[in-house]
Design a protein with these regions (language model features):
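Short helix-coil boundary/hinge micro-motifs
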Residues: 1-265, 294, 298-318, 330-342, ...
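Cysteine-rich micro-motifs
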Residues: 267-288
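A contiguous, mid-protein "functional segment" used to position or interact
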Residues: 291
Length: 371
């Protein structure tokens, strides 16, 4: 049997299988810490739009719970499109983006149907919309979990992980201890969370653990044992994945190019992710960052300093009408040729480059080319 299969994953139960530094969810393999890093891209600001979504939905669900029978249909009509939109958003978030979603939409329609609302009102002694509440509660808890986790772990990444000179399991353990156990400002942030008591953050997540047996992909005669972790709350799922990742030397980091959070799995100090660079879609952030770094280094290179000075003067002469368009074009071409030769030939760079880059020489050679 393949690892990561026959799991039960819904909005109120999340299951992952752990093997070495990998985790398996819905039959797919991920590095430990993947979900904790990716979810940071979905929320994290103090006044995040997610907070408004939580507030609006909570108010409507509360109204539906206490409303008279005659008013419940109108409230449900307001709640249903907002809830449908929220479910759609959740299915873009990890880990739910890897799950089947059709049954959830069907359950939503049934839970908020007029027939079901009327039936619950008549059959329930407290007249509560039982099915609606049982459907909405885990969704609201997930939203709060995402908001709380992202706000807190973004702060952890910025204040602790980002400053580390070494990125390994030992350094991550020390950073987690300093942040979660000793940092008063982090504890104050915990206390000030708008819905902190709903989905409380603990660095020791509450999970159910067991074991799962699976066949080796390379040799079906061999069987192995993975740890199965079951979480009844999304906050515990994300925290476990974060701490499991840190334990294996994996940690979230923010790309200096596009601003997205990504997972690092080695000891290198990260700067850029492998996503598409927003500055130029032809490159990844890593490629674009390397190119810009090289460009900055080039500015300090003696060959480039002289080249930039001369070409700047040529352009100014052209702007002031001292040289023609054709002479400008040929002069710039020659300057680039001398620069490239100097970069390839150290002897020329040390002796002939400065002489050839004199303006009088460049203009004289350019005029020869125009004849």
């Amino acid at each position: 049997m393949k690892i990561g299969t026959d799991q039960y994953n819904t909005f109120d139960t999340m299951t992952m299988d752990c093997w070495n530094d990998r985790v398996y969810y819905e039959g797919k393999e991920f590095p430990a810490g993947h979900f904790a890093a990716e979810i940071l891209n979905f929320a994290g600001a103090i006044h995040d739009p997610l907070l408004e979504r939580i507030t609006v939905l909570t108010a409507l669900v509360d109204d539906l719970s206490t409303a008279e029978k005659s008013k419940r249909h109108d409230i449900a009509a307001q709640l249903k499109p907002l809830l449908r939109n929220t479910v759609s958003w959740l299915y873009t978030c990890p880990p739910f983006c890897y799950c089947e979603s059709q049954s959830t939409y069907e359950n939503l329609e049934h839970a908020l149907s007029e027939e079901r609302l009327d039936r619950d009102y008549e059959e329930e002694e407290a007249h509560l919309p039982y099915l609606t509440l049982s459907f909405c509660e885990p969704i609201l808890r997930i939203l709060v979990a995402i908001y709380n986790f992202c706000l807190l772990i973004r702060a952890f990444e910025m204040k602790y992980l980002r400053r580390l000179k070494r990125r390994n399991a030992d350094a991550f353990a020390k950073a987690a201890h300093e942040c979660f156990d000793e940092d008063d400002s982090f504890l104050i942030l915990l206390e000030q969370m708008p819905f902190g008591e709903v989905e409380e953050f603990f660095s020791y997540p509450r999970v159910v653990t067991g074991f799962k047996y699976f066949q080796d992909e390379n040799d079906e005669k061999k069987w192995k044992t993975a740890q199965r972790v079951i979480c009844k709350r999304a906050i515990d799922f994300y925290v476990f994945d974060l701490m499991n990742g840190l334990h294996h030397g994996h940690a979230p980091s923010q790309c200096q190019g596009c601003g997205r959070y990504f997972l690092t799995t080695n000891g290198h100090i990260p700067k850029y992710c492998d996503g598409v660079a927003p500055q130029d879609s032809r490159y990844t952030c890593r490629q674009y960052g390397a190119m810009m770094h090289q460009k900055e280094q080039n500015k300090q290179h003696p060959v480039y300093r002289l080249f930039n000075t001369r070409t700047g003067t040529i352009r100014k002469h052209h702007q002031r009408g001292k040289i023609s368009d054709d002479l400008r074009r040929e002069a710039l071409y020659l300057a680039e040729s001398y620069r490239d030769k100097a970069l390839m030939d150290n002897d020329y760079a040390a002796d002939g480059y400065a002489r050839d880059m004199e303006l009088e020489h460049i203009y004289a050679e350019a005029e020869k080319r125009l004849k």
